[in-house]
Amino acid sequence: SMEEAVNEVGSQLGRRGEADLALVFASTAYASDLPRLLPLLRRELSSRHWLGAAGGGVVGTRADGTAAEIEQAPSLSVTLLNLPGAAIDSVALSTTSLPDLDGSAQTWQEWSGLNPQHCRSQILLIDPTSSNINDLISGMDYAFPGAEKIGGIACPHNAPHGSLLFDDRVVTGA
């Protein structure tokens, strides 16, 4: 069950103190329970920021330290990052109404709420039901050309909510 997976993660990582960022990846086997996942994890782990997605396959490290990829089966992976001196700005973006791609970079920067002078890297996770995915990626590249970007598109599922985990809620968009 998801509760057992959360308890196992908590027993492995709970003694580490507060992290700056928690990256959470849950298999779509837990799709209907995604709204409960972050509140359960927050009881076990402490992090200033939470970000994650549902996936068809989840990569992580087992309790014995070996790497594993689990596909199409219940799985949960949590990575806690301590980033001394880093400033983390987390934003949830709606992809339904993007700025014009022919507009200014400043318009995209203001729309995203990110300061280009402090944005050296980005983790961009996108819900598979989002519209304008290519335009979003192009716009973020245009607005933040010097920022390194990593991320991907979450896995679709049949639950009536998004696939992205953001702070304490499940969202769509990016």
Predicted regions: what is each one?
Residues 1-174:
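Cofactor- and metal-binding active-site motifs of prokaryotic enzymes
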